[in-house]
Amino acid sequence: MDIRKKQRAVVAALEDVKGREVVVYNVARHASIFERVVIASGDSNRQVNALAASVQQRMKALGARVYGVEGRRNADWVLVDLGDIVVHVMHPAARSYYNLEELWGGKEVSFKRPAAAPVRGKTAPRRRRK
């Protein structure tokens, strides 16, 4: 599977379960084993596990191999190994402490997020100026 397609699927899987602060880094120059690092935050152990499970399910549905998942028991930091992409799902405190963004220091990959659906219905009334 093309790395960009796989990357988009990972980001979509994380956003489906309300993953926060999702970033993708191109680390091909820093690591010979994988090309991308994806980092996302979850607010609770349950959400961190759900985010990792969402990535795992999406990849399996697309026919991509999941090489391993580590950290589910503790769920402060769960790592999903997809071969050419490594996904880190972390609590905000763990993310701040380990600071993987600085460690990898790779080039952040820009990706197009799907456009949000317009909200239909009544709009809030305008405020009057005094």
Predicted region positions:
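Polybasic/polar functional segments that serve as interface/processing modules
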Residues: 1-34, 43-78, 92-94, 101-130
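Conserved acidic residues
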Residues: 35, 84
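Active-site beta-strand termini and strand-to-loop segments that position acidic
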Residues: 80-82
